[in-house]
């Protein structure tokens, strides 16, 4: 087999008949599969052992040779080679066709490649291929020209002969008539009889003349057709064609079916055609030019590659290996078979019948019909259903053809090449393990034993508990006591990977050190639940085992959960205290007024601990404590003689002293009440300042303290804890009266329905807020429900309002607010009507969530596809450029404060230029990493904006460079070379997709003014679609004039430079952003609404459209409170603007109208300019992510994304070569991905094991029988059951 590591690129092309015969190991001549009695393959059939290899290892068909020692011998009796059975997965056969057929991909695809090449309409092409019309394939123009006078004379003579014969015939008839009349007269017949005879004779003479004239006309028609005949003419009239062939057969050739096309392609002059097309492009206009451009693409593809157009017509069909289209016996003795066998059988049957008809010399019409059926059979085999009705199997199910095998989620690409099931894995339900450390997980003993089985067996043999692997295996299966001790030893320091589906971002798979636990559930640490988005209501997780030393090292160093505290999307910690932990820490840091022991002094925390143990002080009592080892809090005012490092006395509580013991040494003492936000801020600060190990230890300490004190805080919720405000009825009365007044005014006709609605909505919104305030004021501090909300542990005030205040206004299915409020709360209970109108919103919410999940998943898939080859390829690209970002703004008091968006824009980037203050002094040099501390320094120096490096300005030819990307948000350090930043970006944008809303907001019930928001808006931006009702932007600088007509406004801009005025018609409903006489700059938005990004690109250029898109995407995410760093969005947008559209090709090899990557365009121009030629010109193009993914240079990546057959057709014609730079291409062919530790600079390092390591190496393979089993490149040996398409082996999916 081919070793994937020995080639660097993969080319696809058209196979000729000779190629197919070369691949083949023999011709399949019979449609038989296996013998019904012996169940062995039939000779020369679809499963023939002679062609495809033996069905049993080292055994021929007739059984003469059985054993490895006969390896390589070909049995002289049955002709089968003695070899391994797995060759049946790789050996191909072929079918020799009795008549050529066209390949349906090239004729039926859109656009039809065959049609473009031959300049034939697809309809005409179909007529020829399916035997409905003849096609002229060759005309001998010279001899026709030479012999034309002779032929004309000959035709003239023939016409004269016809004329003479007609005259003679008419004359004879005339004579006969006269004789008849004379005879009748002699007999004395009546005039009536004589008239009848005369009419009959005249009719006959007329027929003679007509017949003769018709023959002469036919002669003229045949001769005219012959005179004007040219190659590629179609002739649907069979009689006319036969006449032509009989008379002038030596001057032309013609035919029908694929054979005619084959002759045509054989004589096709590509170079001449390309030259004439180039001439058309130079001189032509409009449609003609556009068609010539499209045709030139196809013609030049054949011209510039080794492909021959003859490859589009097949003389023989390849037969794929039998183990890839298996036939297996089911329990009932029936057989299940792959659809391909049925399709191949149809081809073979029709082919054999056609051969027989040809041998018999059957009439042409019968043979042509059989040829047509053969063509249709091959079409169905390649792409069933592409033309006409699909071939169906039992139960009217369309059969799966070769194309269907590749397409879609269940196709070869996505099901088997990009995602495989792996060994050494298990899955189980998860439960919480509060006793675990952050880097640990609890693994059920039985599962661990099964996962680590080979390691345990090897160790048992090493420790002499077992004689050989076989007995060790028996020991493990019987679970002897010694096995558990060995298991304990084997799993120490051997990390396992845990994964929870759906894996939306890289934190969905993390490594943990396993701890053996009883039971059958996996235990996970409570702090990693956020990253996995896991809860314990029945979620399941999968466990995978890294086997090799390298895999274990990577799992431990890169994937261990304690090394993944930060979110890759925002760079802030994800492992935050939540729920009970928040409650516990909140309880610890609280102060109770007048509690036991208030005001006492203690000389140390230990003394306070004694008092607490003796129950002399309350946890939350205010006490004075002398602290020695701590750093005082920032707000503490030190006495005059105090020096840093001295002990100090602080008014605090014993709880806060305990809390500070959980924090690292030297961290300022925290003397405040900590709700969730404050706790998050502390974790955030720790992550910025301390190493990861310390942060993980602190988090564990906080977790333990949180759980311990949450238990002891006694927070419980009873129904009496939901306290409704006592004055609720009075508040409601007041608003009831106001609402009544509005209803009366409406009844009298003072208000329109619209006004009444908005008034009522306003009144009841006020009422709801008033009641919420009263309710909040009414809650006692110590109320458990209030504590839960106040600490941030669970719920929010809106939910409490619904429990204890009033539910307020709800919306109907259309999304409009119903002006009747729900006055009750859940504590009192709703009336039936109130309950009923509540159900609208609830039901819509659930339906929305289901739709959103699917849409969000699809968006993530497209984002991954467009950005998968963006990898950090170099340290520094050396660019001077960057983008200007705002880092601070003036507060209300005129002091600079940090800009609220600095978190997602300037944070974690490298500075592109020095940050210089007003005095011209450098505060921070270029190249520095803008962390929180650096940003603080810059703001202190009074600088408002800085220039930072960005992926948008990076000049790396492939991927991005480390400095332009800046800090890796997941690690907090400068990004490593080899980091797959594109995929991280796609995950960071896609993962919160499910949190975005689906709705289109209705502004005041006006249908036309919907503003698209949420997920659909993000999709609209990334797909670069023109938004509905787009807002125009000014193309010039000038003054505004506004003209009103009945239906529209016209915004007219009078340019400053005196050129022609530009008018923008806008609807009267739109809100104008400009006033009469106002001066506007280029690119100013004229009305409210979404701007078309293509317009921004055209008017303001690529940089502005990049910033516009980043800003617009961020707007959607910010509105939902999701924090994503700009750099992720920039990477996607960089991919959208990677290509240019060639306008003039100059002397380059580029074609006008072609989309090429900017790097290739610049390289080609550089080459042409160096030799003194004329360079090409182009303009930048903004492509949506789907289109950009399909336009990628890598055909493997594009084919595995969407439109598989179209991509492969195109790639094959262009003989495209995939240089394997992205991730998907390498996964597909089974190479290490060129990212992370797979990039070449890491792959070239060899690690030599020490002697101890060599001794301790565990062998993993072949523990079944002690022998080393060689597995081929296609997976396990033939003993394995093959899942068939008929049975739906769906993956278990997400059980949540």
From Swiss-Prot:
GO cellular component: DNA-directed RNA polymerase complex
Sequence positions that bind Zn(2+) 2: 877, 954, 961, 964
Source lineage: Bacteria, Bacillati, Actinomycetota, Actinomycetes, Frankiales
Residues the record lists as binding Zn(2+) 1: 60, 62, 75, 78
Subunit structure: The RNAP catalytic core consists of 2 alpha, 1 beta, 1 beta' and 1 omega subunit. When a sigma factor is associated with the core the holoenzyme is formed, which can initiate transcription.
The entry's keywords: DNA-directed RNA polymerase, Magnesium, Metal-binding, Nucleotidyltransferase, Transcription, Transferase, Zinc
Top-level taxon: Bacteria
Family per record: Belongs to the RNA polymerase beta' chain family.
Protein name stated in the entry: DNA-directed RNA polymerase subunit beta'
Source species of the chain: Parafrankia sp. (strain EAN1pec)
InterPro entries given in the database record: DNA-dir_RpoC_beta_prime, DNA-dir_RpoC_beta_prime_bact, RNA_pol_asu, RNA_pol_N, RNA_pol_Rpb1_1, RNA_pol_Rpb1_3, RNA_pol_Rpb1_3_sf, RNA_pol_Rpb1_4
GO molecular function terms attached to this record: DNA binding; DNA-directed RNA polymerase activity; magnesium ion binding; zinc ion binding
